[in-house]
A protein has these predicted regions:
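Short glycine-/small-residue-rich Rossmann-like dinucleotide-binding loops
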Residues: 37, 77, 94, 249-250, ...
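NAD(P)H dinucleotide-binding glycine-rich loop of Rossmann-like/cofactor-binding domains
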Residues: 58-62, 67, 97-178, 209
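Residues in the short beta-alpha loop(s) of Rossmann-like NAD(P)-binding domains
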Residues: 205, 274, 298
Length: 350
């Protein structure tokens, strides 16, 4: 089958042929990929930052990335009875076992036997991808794979972060969202759908801030290199600071901004990564009793919830579409900060 292949770290992806996936387990599902989201994690993979993950998984280069997939079922294992060939589906990023303590507790994203297509197994930047039946969510009627694919990781990650914030993001509070890009634009909408907190969005892109207002933000602030935006945000909170910060950036200074924006007993939900905090930052969080909460991709159940929000029109994805052969254009567009919403590759069409 045709695929976009990572053959060398920090070099362009190459279009070529790789083996088709095959059914090896009773619950396996093979999907013809109609859309695959392009994620910043794919850039980290491209840079070689997941080389140790690959080594532990017993794989290496060449490798097929892509962990946000949607399309149509092409083949199912003999144990799959609730799905059929031709069904339009989106895929939770992880193929999980269902039996380990994490799965039984409903925390399937922490499955001890997980398979992660696109990160630790061949992914969706190809005509076909293999997962298992536990990862499959039907696409609602009227929704396309292009619309569905970014929900599977970008959407699900943003949604889980929002759910973690809800206990504190009650009416009369301030929630600051750092970043209105691929994850942030989904998080803003999910937060607006589920909460009446005052939403303040910070981003370096003026166009993204304009769109943030249409997504449900109450106030927007342009991030500046002199960091004057921190004082501006605190002024919008009448000096109290944020009850919650949702940091969808996690680098480039945003990780420091998040700490300085927190009010007393504030919570920093950390989603983006790549930055560093100095040890003396602890003195800024001790007295106000600030808390830090890590947040990763959500559960299967949360993906079903998010799809329901999208079906009702409460969450609408902004996407920029590329053919599979345009993968290097997609990578550079994201890397250079020019991506509008979420980049989506289209390996095959209906």
């Amino acid at each position: 089958m045709r695929a976009a292949i990572l053959t060398q770290y920090s070099h362009d992806f190459e279009l070529g042929q790789v083996d088709d996936p095959v059914i090896t387990g009773a619950n396996d599902v093979i999907v013809r990929v109609g859309a695959a989201g392009f994620c910043r994690t794919d850039i980290h993979l491209w840079l070689g930052q997941f080389e140790e993950v690959h080594r532990q998984a017993g794989i290496g280069l060449p490798f097929v990335c892509g962990h946000e997939s949607a399309g149509w079922i092409a083949e199912i294992g003999p144990g799959v009875t609730h799905l059929k060939v031709g069904d339009a589906v989106l895929l939770h990023p992880l193929a999980t076992c269902g039996y380990c303590p994490a799965c039984r507790a409903g925390d399937d994203m922490h499955c001890s036997a997980q398979i992660f297509p696109g990160v630790a197994a061949p992914g969706g930047f190809a005509e076909y991808v293999k997962t298992n039946a536990r990862a499959v969510v039907p696409i609602p009627e009227g929704m396309t794979p292009v619309e569905a694919a970014p929900l599977t990781d970008a959407g699900l990650t943003a949604y889980r972060a929002v759910k973690k914030a809800l206990a504190r993001a009650v009416p009369g509070t301030y929630t600051v969202v750092l970043g209105a890009g691929g994850l942030g634009h989904i998080g803003i909408q999910a937060l607006r759908a589920l909460s009446q907190t005052e939403i303040i969005v910070v981003d370096r892109n003026e166009a993204a801030l304009e769109r943030a207002l249409s997504w449900g933000a109450d106030q927007v602030v342009l991030a500046r290199h002199d960091r004057s935006h921190v004082a501006e945000v605190r002024e919008l909170t009448h000096g109290a600071g944020a009850n919650v910060v949702l940091d969808f950036v996690g680098e480039g200074g945003a990780e420091v901004d998040a700490v300085e924006l927190l009010g007393s007993n504030g919570m920093d939900v950390i989603v983006g990564y790549g930055g560093r905090l100095e040890a003396d930052i602890l003195t800024q969080v001790l007295t106000p009793e600030a808390s830090f909460v890590g947040s990763t991709v959500g559960t299967y159940t949360e993906l079903v919830e998010l799809v329901a929000l999208a079906r009702r029109g409460a969450v609408k994805l902004s996407t920029q579409i590329f053919p599979l052969e345009g993968i290097n254009d997609a990578m550079r567009t994201l890397e250079q900060g020019r991506m509008i919403g979420r980049g989506v590759l289209v390996p095959t069409q209906d």
